Amino acid sequence: MKSLKAKFRKSDTNEWNKNDDRLLQAVENGDAEKVASLLGKKGASATKHDSEGKTAFHLAAAKGHVECLKVMVTHGVDVTAQDSSGHSALHVAAKNGHPECIRKLLQYKSPAENIDNSGKTALHYAAAQGCLQAVQLLCEHKSPINLKDLDGNIPLLVAVQNGHSEACHFLLDHGADVNSRDKNGRTALMLACETGSSNTVDALIKKGADLSLVDSLGHNALHYSKLSENAGIQNLLLSKISQDADLKTPTKPKQHDQVSKISSERSGTPKKRKAPPPPISPTQLSDVSSPRSITSTPLSGKESVFFAEAPFKAEISSIQENKDRLSDSTAGADSLLDISSEADQQDLLVLLQAKVASLTLHNKELQDKLQAKSPKDKEAEADLSFQSFHSTQTDLAPSPGKASDIPSSDAKSSPPVEHPAGTSTTDNDVIIRQLQDSLHDLQKRLESSEAEKKQLQDELQSQRTDTLCLNNTEISENGSDLSQKLKETQSKYEEAMKEVLSVQKQMKLGLLSQESADGYSHLREAPADEDIDTLKQDLQKAVEESARNKERVRELETKLAEKEQAEATKPPAEACEELRSSYCSVIENMNKEKAFLFEKYQQAQEEIMKLKDTLKSQMPQEAPDDSGDMKEAMNRMIDELNKQVSELSQLYREAQAELEDYRKRKSLEDAAEYIHKAEHERLMHVSNLSRAKSEEALSEMKSQYSKVLNELTQLKQLVDAHKENSVSITEHLQVITTLRTTAKEMEEKISALTGHLANKEAEVAKLEKQLAEEKAAVSDAMVPKSSYEKLQASLESEVNALATKLKESVREREKAHSEVAQVRSEVSQARREKDNIQTLLKAKEQEVTALVQKFQRAQEELAGMRRCSETSSKLEEDKDEKINEMTREVLKLKEALNSLSQLSYSTSSSKRQSQQLDLLQQQVKQLQNQLAECKKHHQEVISVYRMHLLYAVQGQMDEDVQKVLKQILTMCKNQSQKK
């Protein structure tokens, strides 16, 4: 019989088997049918990890087998299952750039916001891969776009690092943080400059990337663009920096105020200074001090030699504190220079130069106070003047070391105290080394600052030359003069710095040989003071000249910008004015030509009247009746012609009135500058109608003129006929010639006028087209006055209605905001409930697995119970056999008793027989009772087995029942062992 462990041993479903190997191979080959058949087999699971931590589900996502993924999901695979590195299938699909797999997984409710062990979402991997479709899908399914991984990278930074500009554009359009930083403080703009992607840099700048941000090492985007050596990116950044600087120029006085506030705050709360050591004196720092300070006599118990009075000593200490405050303020300004970007250094340098000038003035005031207090303190004054010069030098340097300034300032500002003759050489060596280190630092920083200044000046000169080429020659000459002056100031500044370095070298030599060459230092004192003063003056002049030159350059730049703006704004206005003037001149010319034509028409009418008069005078009084009829016909024709002429004159007057109205409207339009499109169309329609009428009038005039000519010819014929009868030939010829000449002149004039009129009509058409285009361009944005007056009342009512609607919409918006907040809270609660449901589902799944295991155990126990029932049935059969044997023995005993009774009856007494019979009867009763009890127990056991079997089939076995079954099995085992 099997052991109890073998009965209750549960099969380990997580063990790797052959089916799992086959499943991996099928997924590798992309065989969806084989995957489906293998998943139906026992022990095969798509989320089971192999030795490398890989699963079949993740392999399908990595290979991009969509059909395999479908089959696995339909077989109940957990979509959120992770591999050994915490990647879900969505992470793997995004990492390998399979948008179809991503779409399917998102359809199967795979969460897009899940992160792996490195804190990355699927969007991080899609951005790193540069797959635009994958990025779009994940953004549509609300993947967090500004979530940082463990390295501090958001998807935008990852896309920029890998140079995927399209993904960067998409992420920026969907709300990615432009100024987000990683662990090292680098922004997306810095990374784009480092990779040399000009398109990405342009997109980031357009989206508002901050160019003044620096990383943890203090480098800005311009530094990274220099590393990539991309000139296009550098020019782009410099142009943006210059634009920002132009926008910030009005706020420069505020910056100056802020710097002054910082310096005042620092001066208001001075730092604690360490007292200088007693052996150090001003003679150890400069050879300009007097040898009187180096004496072998010890200090007196009250005061020093130079500062004998207590108030004077207090004032000197206050001066020293002021100097320390000033040095602190300059150090603060230097720290501002270190923090600021390269583009703002020039502006801050101007502010600091102004600050240097104020500091020198303050030093001069302090020197004047010292001179007023004690005329004997020339050595202290020389020290103070040298200290002021040193402060100007530190202010002009871009970022001098604070540690190198503190000992020098303390040593220089210390009062000249006498020291004993036994000064140690170690202190002098330490001071010399400190001064040498500070000098080296100053030289390096001066060189770096000069290089940066040259770069900035070259860039400024290039920009200025580009802008100044557009301007006149005067500005270019001024710019060249200013550049020459700047170069001269730079050369002066360099010469001054060289002289300062030579003086400092002489100071070092004086420090090394101060004990042996006191007389030499005394001789060099006066020229050193003079050199320092001259250098100070030269330096101040150079600084002032450079400031003036910069101011002039800025003024010229502002003037140039104003001129460019004026030139940019002027041409359209001038063009409009020229068009208006040309249009007005054309209209005036047309009116003049019409007046000229009207005059010509009147002249022609006068000539016709004259001809009629001459005809009347020349007609004979004794004319026949036919001539009277002809006269009447001619008079009728003349009347008709007069009527037509009057009608034409009326039409002309109407056209002239319309022209005057049009002129008035045009003047009103010019006063109002523009008209509405509808009004313009109406005016154009009126002008077209007037032009059509004028053309019709002209055509009618031409037709009438032709009729008049025809009539004139007829009249001439009649006159000729009459003249043949009555008038002389000479007069007739003269009249004919005059008429012909006048007719020819009239025809020539008419032809010239028609050609001129055609040209003018073409010009009018061109001008009308131009005017229509201009007014169409302008009228879209203008409102007509007529419609404005009509719509004003309606608009006011609409405004009131809209105001009420706006109030209602504001209320509704507030309600909507509250509802949105409620919805958000409900969504958060729903998410929490979803998480709780997921946890409950996981717990239920665990319970289901436990129940399945229990069911398997119950099945095994049922099998054991069946075996036990078989054994119990065998036991019952054995018991039945025993009972039968017992009954047989009882019968045998009865027979024996009967035989014994017969024998005993014959041999023994009756009393003994009765006792034996009683004993045998008692034994028989006991055996019968035992049989009945065995049957009852057997029935009870069978009923219990049946009940437990039913519970096991229904899956409702209790722990107590399991314990009882185990006990039964142990009992059966013990019984079998006993047998």
Swiss-Prot record:
Modified residues (Phosphoserine): 11, 281, 286, 293, 300, 304, 318, 327, 329, 340-341, 358, 513, 516, 667, 694, 914
Expression sites by tissue: Highly expressed in testis, where it localizes to seminiferous tubules (at protein level). Expressed in ganglion cell layer and in Muller cell fibers of the retina (at protein level). In small intestine highly expressed at the apical and lateral borders of absorptive epithelia (at protein level). In liver highly expressed along the bile canaliculi (at protein level).
Nuclear localization signal, short sequence motif: residues: 270-276
Pfam families listed in its UniProt record: Ank (PF00023), Ank_2 (PF12796)
Cleavable signal peptide: none
Coiled-coil region: 349-374, 430-943
ANK-type repeats, residues: 18-51, 52-81, 85-114, 118-147, 151-180, 184-213, 217-247
UniProt biased composition (Polar residues): 282-299, 458-467
GO MF assignments: actin binding
GO biological process, one term: cell differentiation
Region of interest: Disordered: 247-299, 392-429, 446-467
Swiss-Prot/TrEMBL keywords: Acetylation, ANK repeat, Cell junction, Coiled coil, Cytoplasm, Cytoskeleton, Differentiation, Nucleus, Phosphoprotein, Repeat, Spermatogenesis
Places the protein is found: Cytoplasm, Cytoskeleton; Cytoplasm, Cytoskeleton, Stress fiber; Cytoplasm, Cell cortex; Cell junction
Modified residues (Phosphothreonine): T249, T295, T297
SMART domains listed in its UniProt record: ANK
GO cellular component, one term: nucleoplasm
Chain intervals with Basic and acidic residues compositional bias: 247-259, 446-457
Residues recorded as bearing N-acetylmethionine in the entry: M1
Quaternary state and interactors: Interacts with PALLD. Associates with actin. However, does not bind F-actin directly.
Function: Plays a role in actin regulation at the ectoplasmic specialization, a type of cell junction specific to testis. Important for establishment of sperm polarity and normal spermatid adhesion. May also promote integrity of Sertoli cell tight junctions at the blood-testis barrier.
Stated name of the protein: Ankycorbin
